[in-house]
Amino acid sequence: MQEQKLVKGQQISLSLVSWGRLGEAMGQWEETDVFVTGGIPGEKVVAEVVRVHRRYAAASVIEVLEASEWRVEPPCPYYGVCSGCQWQHVDYRRQLTVKQEKVADALHRVGDFIEPPVLPVRPSPIQYGYRNHARFTINRDGDLGFVNRQTRQFVRIDRCMLMHEGINGPLAELQGKCAETSQLSIRSGQETRDTLVQPTLINPEISLASGQKFYGDSIDGHAFRVSSPSFFQVNVEQTVQVVQVIREALEVKKTDVLLDAYTGVGTFAVLMAPYVGKVIAVEESSAAVADARLNTGEIPNIELVLGKTEDVLPNLTEKPDAAILDPPRAGCHPRTIESLIDLSPPKIAYVSCDAETLGRDLNLLCESAYTLEQVVPLDMFPQTHHVECVALLTRKSPAAPIILASASPRRRELLTGLGLVFQVVPSDIPEEPQPGEPPSKMAERLSLEKAQAVAARFQHGFVIAADSVV
């Protein structure tokens, strides 16, 4: 019997069994994996095929035949059409547990951790209206909106429920008036309501100011200037909790030197500076460093270094007591990992928005130098499948060396046969008997004296001076 082929527009019934990597629910139809937006594992649905690939298909729920207990009514009128959110139809409590499972799965699958120590996800203080940045596509009519990830169709958006009012206000004013450009970015401080609109708009119908080079925002009472090309956390309220997790993990002291790699506009450097002796903040973006110089200007214990992290770390002359890594989604350059292992800070807090690249980098760090103590996921992006993580690593204690203070051929052969690595350190103890000393007592005394003499040269290790003296 010839296998049936799916076609775009076809409606199919299927049972959903698991979550996909991008937040869809997955089922099978005639041995073809189908990734279904708007579904929940455990449900039976009717879905319409929107794209067909060689090995899988994408579909969208049009009818729920058997609903999950976790299904809720999405509040957004654009939900399911715009694709910016994936999980508005999923109870928020379930969103958090699924994100924990996804992080653990990625660390196991990519990082090769058997039972990764992933803690429960810390919820966001607000589940809607948290974003301070939006990038809109604009159609020929000047309408602002988003492009559906699967169908590639443009969807006009008059109000986004993930954005706070500092975004939605300008969106309403600009809607239908921006045909002069194809992309438009709006950024706005959640507390300051300071706004940046890029690019510059010349339509005389638009009264809203545009073309600003930067805007101001604040986190936990600290003001930050953010230039148009610079990265800044999109969920300011949850960022406060991220910093709290980092502080708890690193347990820094007022005398510590803290490395803040990929510092951006200096967010973590500014928020951690009061708790350490010095922060070395590294960033490759010249625009972000210019922002960071203003943001850290009155904080004397922050040293800013412009350059790629993988180029700066090998040349650091000061060894950090702790380190924060907050790389882009692609993760750390291999040379960054190598240099960090050489610098050997006792504790590292690795902040990541991609669990798979996090797993890859943690695997490299933990191969020989570090132990993964815990991973704290934080919900920086409610209603989506994305999740932020803070991983805590502690430096492994160096293996205690085996030192031979007396290396007979038999002793060498025995240790080598056991696969043990050792070094021979001869002592200067003269092998002379004391008056009236029996040979057995002489051997015992010399072994102890040799062991004590050699042990005085080392801070730690196992010193062997006889077959029975360690």
Model-derived features with residue positions:
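Short alpha-helix immediately C-terminal to the canonical SAM-binding loop
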Residues: 289-290, 358, 412
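Accessory RNA-recognition modules of RNA-modification enzymes
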Residues: 1-325, 330-338, 344
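Conserved beta-strand elements of the Class I
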Residues: 257-259, 349, 403
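Conserved beta-loop-beta/alpha segment of the NTase-like Rossmann-fold superfamily
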Residues: 460-470
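The conserved SAM/SAH-binding core of class I Rossmann-like methyltransferase domains
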Residues: 282, 351, 425
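N-terminal polybasic phosphate/anion-binding patch
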Residues: 397-462
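Residue-level signal for inorganic ion chemistry
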Residues: 27, 42, 85, 354, ...
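S-adenosylmethionine
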Residues: 305-387, 394
